Every structure is written in structure tokens, then in C-alpha cells.
Amino acid sequence: MPDNLKLLTKDYFNRHPIKDISAARFEYSMLLHPEVMDIADEVIPELQAKGLSFPDDSAAVAAVEKEDETARLLRMLRKTLPPKANRVLLEKVLPREEEVLPEIQRMILKEFSDSTIENCTRYLVRCRTNCSEWIIQNYNSIREPYARSMLCLVLGFRAGLDAIPFLMQQVEVFETCFPSETFDQGPILALSELKVRFRTV
């Protein structure tokens, strides 16, 4: 599908620009540079020593670390946790893919919580199974536009060039149906990532 890559021209991104601030942009940055959060974890104690205060996430992190039952870990994925606790949780569920992935997929189809969708997005980007085909096949069953936008982002990291027309279509849908929102940024950032992944020197 190399011809699909030719659709992603400079003119296309001028007409559908990447915005400086959006939920998808934040999530994309975290997926692309997860080490940023690790650096933040190292810097926070220094800032605390200088008198700055931050929410204490140690209890949430400890609760995730001591939990070993998959069903309870999955319930935690539905909660809003501090960023560090979320990262610990993701590392615990990734090796349990056979049990966890079907439940993640069920959550995506049923859940409306933004934090749950964000956790599921991070999981799908990093799990061994490439769920691109599943996302496209089940896309119309996902009712929440925010969830759809985030799943488009997953396609940017995991799908092939054959996903480009689908993502371009979603950009048009979001821009038409939700002109005052930034849902279009999910598929736009996905297209940008696909262009980077498959560009030829």
C-alpha cells in the first residue's frame, strides 16, 4: 500500500493541522516518550525538598504493586489513578495478555470513562497482539467519540499503510460532527505517526 503514503502530503497536514493542545496530543507524547514520566518521578523529590508540594501517590502505587489477582488489576484499569500507579499497573497486566486482552476489548466496547479508555489505549499500543484489525472491525460499535479518537491513535502506532484511508475518513467525520472539539486530533496524529514509521529515505 505505498500509494496510500502519498496521500499524506504537506498540503494535507496544512489543511488538517496538529494542534498544540489536545487530549490526543498529550496521550501521543506519553506514548512516544514514556521516559518523560520516569524523569518526572526522579525530579519530583528534588522539587519537594525545595518546598513544592505534589499529591502523594505512594499509597496507590503500593496498592497496585501488592495486587496479584488479574480480575482486581482489571478493575483498577477502570479507575482514575495517579500517573505513576497507572504505569506500574500497565507493567503488571502486559505479561497476562491471554487473560487481559479479551477483557480490555470488552471494556473498550462498554466503558465511557476517559481514564479507562486512556489505560486501554496504552495497553493496545504495547501489547504483543496487534489489534489494528479488531479496532477497525469494531469501530462502529464504539459509541463514545473520545474512545474512537484514542483508538485511532493506536492505529498510528500499530497499523499498516492500509489504515490511512480509514483514518483520513475519521478526520473528516470528527471535523464535521464535532467542529468545536479536538477529537480529530487522534486520527491526525495517527496519520502523522504512520508517515514517520513508513517514510522512505
Regions flagged by a language model, labelled:
Residues 102-106, 133-138, 162-170, 200-201:
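Short sequence/structural elements of tandem HEAT/ARM alpha-solenoid repeats
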Residues 171-175:
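TPR/TPR-like (Sel1-like) alpha-helical repeat modules
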Residues 10-16, 23-34, 42-65, 75-79, ...:
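Structural detector for internal amphipathic alpha-helices that build alpha-solenoid repeat scaffolds
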